[in-house]
Amino acid sequence: MPSMAEIYVKELRERDPATVDTLFLDNAEDGQIGGLTDQLINLEMLSMVKCGLTTLAGFPTLPALTYLDISDNQLGDNASFDVLVKNAPDLKKITLASNKLSLDNLRCLKVLPNLFELDLSNNPSLGLLEDYREKMFEMIPSLKILDGCDVDGEEVEEEFAGEGGEDSEEGSGDEDGPGLSYLEKSQFSDDETDDYAPEGGDAEPRGTKRGASDNGEEPDNKKAAGDDE
């Protein structure tokens, strides 16, 4: 497999780095960040999945970056997340699934003012932590979605197509939603979202919040609405 620097050159395709808004540098074999420059001033989405990363040392200055996917790496005590606070201050979503993270490794992320969503699934130490979700939401005040569920534990479905994707209109009903520009690159048809209803009854539109469990129990807000009627 090629190094990250080699993948970067290939992905760049002789484009001006300042014009690039999305980069996929997955499966680099050298286990370190390399090749990226501070010229990527308009980069909004960066993926470095399965690169064997143990640290984010060498992370470039990316002022427009809103979504970072660094899942399936070896990030842990030496992750150096403070570099994200300094070099990517506008981050709204970070995917950190399948790493080796602890709560202490993530404390510096609370300084990111717009951090809206984190995916920390499949981090063994976090999975064993008592009251893990409560502690994360308390530690990062701006956080609204953790591991695909909101602060109330209700699942938030997100739809992505290709390199970006767009949440359905109903799914983005929260006024304080992330509004990531990379989500605007493709659209789902109305048949797949708002107008979908299977035979035999009403269906919940895709892209809306639903209970994280499938036990059939109605959320409290729906029960309250029924009582009012």
From Swiss-Prot:
UniProt organism field: Caenorhabditis elegans
Ranges of compositional bias, category Basic and acidic residues: 219-229
LRR repeat copies, ranges: 19-40, 42-63, 64-85, 90-110
Name listed for the protein in its UniProt record: Acidic leucine-rich nuclear phosphoprotein 32-related protein 1
Record-stated family: Belongs to the ANP32 family.
Keyword Hydrolase attached: no
UniProt KW keywords: Leucine-rich repeat, Repeat
Superkingdom of origin organism: Eukaryota
SMART domains on file: LRRcap
